[in-house]
Amino acid sequence: MYAWLNALPKAELHLHLEGSLEPELLFALAERNKVALPWPDVESLRKAYAFNNLQEFLDLYYQGANVLRTEQDFYDLTWAYLRKCKEQNVVHTEPFFDPQTHTDRGIPFETVLSGIGQALEDGRKRLGIGSGLILSFLRHLSEEEAHKTLDQALPFRHAFIAVGLDSSEKGHPPRKFRQVFERARAEGFATVAHAGEEGPPEYIWEALDLLKVKRIDHGVRAAEDPRLLERLIDEQIPLTVCPLSNVKLRVFKDMSEHNILKLLEMGVKVTVNSDDPAYFGGYVTENFVALQESLGMTCEQAERLAQNSLDARLA
């Protein structure tokens, strides 16, 4: 079944580039940039990946991102991910990157963007992988900080297809970023947002009504609100679901409890994605395999999920 699922043409619509930083590359970049790490070797770092919730993961994620310093680093990070896409027949990807994670460390915005952008361009030319980059605001920071990031991005507007919202969800509702999203839309960007992962269904309503998003990232807690489900089905608003991530971060205790196939059968436009694959134990194919092994996903369901991802592209 792995080979068949791997060969299925699919798009990935929920992937954080910084979250695809594998331990081996992290160590190589640390050595290249002479960055001291708190782990003595790759194995120790892998063991540190046994976190229990979103905040513990984010603490590790931001520590790992600290090794990314130069344009070449960002190129190497993105290229490693694109090679994995090629291996798994991901024909199109719309990755997120978090400029604030890097600009707050003194890395120039254009350094980050140049490295990522060049790799995506090479991915199109050399690997045949379509792509569109999404600039994501960090929700644990202020809306004022998000406005500054948008200011930095505007001279490079051609490089992005959308703006998004990620990081710690609890206590940071979408309404906090209403004005910056309004401004981004006025500048011609599509909008997406993480909502309904650890946060309540109300956050999904806010993302739809206040941020006017085209897609909801995660969104699994929509199942708690029948009226919201009805709207998602009626308007065919895609959810970019990340099964392995959800289990690793305890959104579901076990993959056997995941609701993605129930949502699919209800008519919700759900898609399968890897989120932060270096940290969550698998890329897109591994997420499909987990659904097949734990939920008995059929070939027909897998084909529908893959087609949903291709249909839900912004670029």
Curated annotation (Swiss-Prot):
Known cofactor(s): Zn(2+)
GO biological process, one term: adenine catabolic process
Cofactor binding summary note: Binds 1 zinc ion per subunit.
Residues given in the record as substrate binding sites: D276
Binding positions for Zn(2+) per the UniProt entry: H14, H16, H194, D275
CDD domains: ADA
Swiss-Prot/TrEMBL catalytic activity: adenine + H2O + H(+) = hypoxanthine + NH4(+)
A Pfam family reported for this protein in Swiss-Prot or TrEMBL: A_deaminase
PANTHER family, sorted: ADENINE DEAMINASE
Record's protein name: Adenine deaminase
Gene source species: Azotobacter vinelandii (strain DJ / ATCC BAA-1303)
